[in-house]
C-alpha cells in the first residue's frame, strides 16, 4: 500500500474464430511511494487485435516512473491492429512518465493501429515517449505514433512516436519550464523565452552530439521505420532513449527491429525496441531489445516479433536503472504456422522487480504456439518477474526481504499440437522469500494437455515453496497433463502443494488422467506440501479409464511439522 511497486497487467487472450483479441489488463497504480505497473499486451485477433493495457500511475509521493503502456495485439486476417496503451503518469515530485505502447500491426488490408501516448512526469522527470504506430503489410495505412508527454519543471518533453508508412508521427511534448529540451516532433513554441531556452540548450548540445553521438540534455532520436535502425541514446545528463525502428518489410524474411536507445545517466527511460518486420514466406523478424536505464529510470519494452511462416521472437526487455526504476517487459512473439517465442523480461535494479516475459506468438491450427519469455530476475531487493505463457518466472533478488520469485507463465494453447508445459516458478531470495508458483499447463483441442510447471524453492532461511501448476485437461482421446511438483521451503516455512493432474476427454474412456504433482518438502520447522490429485479419466472417471496417479505429500520439517497429505486418485 505504501512502498510496493504495482502489479503488471495481464496479457489479453488470442482470438481464433472470434473477431477481436482480448485487451491487455491495465497496470496497477503504485502505493503512496510505489511505481506504476506496466500495461499488459493485447492479444492477437483473427480480425482485430486487442488493445494494449494502460500503464498504471505512480503513487503521489513516489520517486518512480509511471508504468509503460502495453503493446497492441496484431490482426492476422483482414482487420486492424490493436491500439497501444497509454503510459502512466509519474508521482508528484520526481519520476518520468511511462512510455506509450506500440500499436499492433495488420497483416492484411486493414490499417495498423496508433501508438499510445506517453505519460506525464513529476516536477523533475521526462515526459514519456509516444509509442510507434503499427505497420500494415497488406496495403492498408500504417498507424500514427502516440504523443509524447510534456515536461513540468526540469526534464525533457517526450518524443512523439514514429508513424508507420503513411502514418503520421505523434506530437512531441515540450520541455520543462526551468530546464529541458522539447521532444522530437514537438510543435514550434509561440513563447520567445521558451524559444531562447531551446536555442541555448541546442548550442550546448552540439559539440556533445558531434563528438559522442548523444546530447548533453535531450532525448535520443527514434529509428526510422522500415529500416531496423536503433534508437539513439538519451542525453548524458538526462533524456529518454529513442524507440527502435521497425524491421524491413517485403522480403522473404522480415528484418530485425532496431534496439531501443539507452536512457540518460541521471534519469531517463530506455527506448522501446522496434517490432520485427513480417516475412512474406519465410521467417518473421526478431523484435528489437528495449533500451536500458542507467541510474534512475525504467527499461524499455522489447519489440514484438514479426509475423511469418515462422514467427519472429520478441525482443528482450531493457534492464531497470541501477537505483530506481522498473524493468522492461519482453516483446510478444510473432504469429505464424509456428509462433515465435516471447522475449525475456529485463532485470531489476537495486530495489526493482524483474520485468514480465513476453507472450509466445500464435501458431496456426496445425502448428505450435511460441513459448513465452522468462521473467527477469529481481534486483538485490526486488521480486522476480512473471514469465510469459510457458516461460519461467524470474528469481527474486539475493537480499530481498520477503519478495517472492516470479510465477511461471501458463503454457501456451494449441488446437492440434500438445499444450505447452507451464513455466517453472522463480526461486525466492537467497535467505528470505517464497518461491513463485508454477504455471498451469497449456490446453490443447485435440492433443495432450500440457504439464504444469514446478513451484520455485524458497530462500534458505524463511519462506514457503511455490505451488506446482495444474496439468491441463485434454479433450477427445488425448491424455491430461501432469501436475507440477511443489517447491521446497526454507528452514522455516511450508512446502508447496503439488499441482493437480489434468483430466482426459469425455470420449477418452481408456486413457488415464494426468499424474498429480509431488508436494514440496519442509526443512526444519513447517509442514510438507500436499500432493496433487490425479486427473479424472474420460467421462469424469465413469467410462472405464483409470484416473491418474496421485502425488505424494512432501516430508515435514526435521524439528517440527507434519508430512503433507497424499493426493486423491
Predicted segments — roles?
Residues 1-569:
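Long, compositionally biased tandem-repeat segments
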Amino acid at each position: 500500500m505504501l512502498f510496493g511497486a504495482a502489479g503488471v497487467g495481464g496479457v489479453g487472450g488470442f482470438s481464433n474464430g472470434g473477431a477481436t483479441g482480448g485487451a491487455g489488463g491495465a497496470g496497477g497504480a503504485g502505493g503512496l511511494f510505489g511505481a506504476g505497473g506496466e500495461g499488459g499486451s493485447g492479444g492477437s485477433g483473427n480480425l482485430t487485435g486487442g488493445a494494449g493495457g494502460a500503464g498504471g500511475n505512480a503513487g503521489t509521493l513516489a520517486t518512480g516512473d509511471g508504468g509503460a503502456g502495453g503493446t497492441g495485439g496484431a490482426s492476422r486476417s483482414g482487420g486492424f491492429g490493436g491500439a497501444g496503451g497509454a503510459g502512466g503518469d509519474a508521482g508528484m515530485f520526481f519520476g518520468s512518465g511511462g512510455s506509450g505502447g506500440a500499436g499492433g500491426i495488420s497483416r492484411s488490408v486493414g490499417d495498423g493501429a496508433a501508438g499510445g501516448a506517453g505519460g506525464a512526469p513529476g516536477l523533475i522527470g521526462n515526459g514519456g515517449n509516444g509509442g510507434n504506430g503499427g505497420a500494415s503489410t497488406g496495403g492498408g495505412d500504417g498507424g500514427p505514433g502516440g504523443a509524447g508527454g510534456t515536461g513540468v519543471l526540469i526534464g525533457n518533453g517526450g518524443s512523439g512516436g514514429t508513424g508507420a508508412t503513411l502514418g503520421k508521427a505523434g506530437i512531441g511534448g515540450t520541455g520543462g519550464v526551468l530546464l529541458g529540451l522539447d521532444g522530437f516532433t514537438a510543435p514550434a513554441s509561440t513563447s520567445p523565452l521558451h524559444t531562447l531556452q531551446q536555442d541555448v540548450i541546442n548550442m550546448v548540445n552540439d559539440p556533445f552530439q558531434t563528438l559522442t553521438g548523444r546530447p548533453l540534455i535531450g532525448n535520443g532520436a527514434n529509428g526510422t521505420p522500415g529500416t531496423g535502425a536503433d534508437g539513439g541514446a538519451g542525453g548524458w545528463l538526462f533524456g529518454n532513449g529513442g524507440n527502435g525502428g521497425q524491421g524491413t518489410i517485403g522480403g522473404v524474411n522480415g528484418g530485425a527491429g532496431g534496439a531501443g536507445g539507452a536512457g540518460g545517466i541521471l534519469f531517463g527511460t530506455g527506448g522501446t525496441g522496434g517490432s520485427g518486420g513480417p516475412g512474406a514466406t519465410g521467417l518473421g523478424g526478431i523484435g528489437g531489445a528495449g533500451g536500458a536505464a542507467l541510474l534512475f529510470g525504467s527499461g524499455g519494452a522489447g519489440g514484438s516479433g514479426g509475423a511469418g511462416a515462422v514467427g519472429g521472437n520478441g525482443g528482450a526487455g531493457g534492464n531497470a536503472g541501477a537505483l530506481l526504476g522498473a524493468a522492461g517487459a519482453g516483446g510478444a512473439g510473432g504469429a505464424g504456422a509456428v509462433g515465435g517465442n516471447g522475449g525475456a523480461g529485463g532485470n531489476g535494479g537495486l530495489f526493482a522487480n524483474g520485468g514480465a516475459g513476453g507472450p509466445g506468438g500464435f501458431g496456426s491450427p496445425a502448428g505450435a504456439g511460441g513459448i513465452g519469455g522468462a521473467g527477469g530476475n529481481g534486483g538485490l531487493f526486488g521480486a522476480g518477474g512473471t514469465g510469459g505463457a510457458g516461460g519461467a518466472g524470474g528469481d527474486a533478488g539475493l537480499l530481498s526481504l520477503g519478495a517472492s520469485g516470479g510465477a511461471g507463465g501458463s503454457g501456451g494453447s494449441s488446437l492440434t499440437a500438445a499444450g505447452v508445459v507451464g513455466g517453472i516458478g522463480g526461486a525466492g531470495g537467497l535467505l528470505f522469500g517464497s518461491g513463485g508458483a508454477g504455471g498451469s499447463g497449456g490446453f490443447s483441442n485435440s492433443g495432450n494437455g500440457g504439464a504444469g510447471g514446478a513451484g520455485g524453492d524458497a530462500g534458505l532461511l524463511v519462506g514457503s515453496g511455490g505451488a506446482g501448476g495444474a496439468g491441463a485437461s485434454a479433450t477427445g482421446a488425448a491424455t491430461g497433463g501432469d501436475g507440477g511438483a511443489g517447491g521446497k521451503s526454507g528452514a522455516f516455512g511450508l512446502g508447496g502443494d503439488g499441482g493437480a493432474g489434468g483430466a482426459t476427454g469425455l470420449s477418452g474412456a481408456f486413457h488415464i488422467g494426468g499424474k498429480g504433482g509431488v508436494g514440496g518438502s519442509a526443512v526444519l520447522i513447517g509442514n510438507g506440501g500436499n500432493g496433487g490429485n490425479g486427473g479424472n479419466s474420460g467421462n469424469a472417471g465413469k467410462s472405464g479409464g483409470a484416473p491418474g496417479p496421485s502425488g505424494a505429500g512432501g516430508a515435514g520439517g526435521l524439528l517440527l511439522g507434519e508430512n503433507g497429505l497424499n493426493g486423491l486418485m
